[in-house]
């Protein structure tokens, strides 16, 4: 094998790696765009089903507990779609839902501690 053949082989490996990297970047970009579209759709639905005060409370809570709020947003959308709650959801109703969620979470923590 001559030096030229080795150089060509090295260039081919570099080209393949570059293509692989570009495909990975494109896939990541597509995934991020899909996530952004889903988030925009969820926010639009929440704008329709929550009063401004309830949305403000949810936004404030999201700063402290983003995972909880994400799960709560999905639950609120499901409740509204199944007509299990009156729309628009006002701040008082949201507080009641949050209180029930907190109590359920607390009950699970107590059971977990007792079950040692």
Curated annotation (Swiss-Prot):
GO terms for cellular component: cytosol. Pfam families: dsDNA_bind. This is DNA-binding protein Tpen_0471. Keywords: DNA-binding. PANTHER family: PROGRAMMED CELL DEATH PROTEIN 5. Belongs to the PDCD5 family. The lineage of its organism: Archaea, Thermoproteota, Thermoprotei, Thermofilales, Thermofilaceae. It comes from Thermofilum pendens (strain DSM 2475 / Hrk 5). One of its GO terms (molecular function) is DNA binding. InterPro entries: DNA_bind_arc, PDCD5-like, PDCD5-like_sf. It comes from the Archaea.
């Amino acid at each position: 094998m001559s030096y030229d053949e080795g150089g060509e082989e090295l260039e081919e490996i570099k080209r393949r790696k570059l293509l692989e990297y570009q495909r990975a970047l494109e896939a990541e970009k597509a995934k991020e765009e899909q996530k952004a579209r889903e988030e925009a759709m969820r926010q639009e639905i929440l704008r329709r089903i929550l009063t401004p005060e309830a949305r403000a409370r949810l936004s404030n809570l999201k700063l402290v507990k983003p995972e909880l709020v994400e799960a709560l947003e999905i639950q609120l959308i499901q409740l509204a779609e199944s007509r299990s709650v009156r729309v628009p959801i006002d701040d008082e109703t949201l507080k009641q839902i949050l209180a029930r969620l907190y109590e359920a979470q607390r009950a699970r923590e107590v059971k977990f501690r007792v079950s040692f």
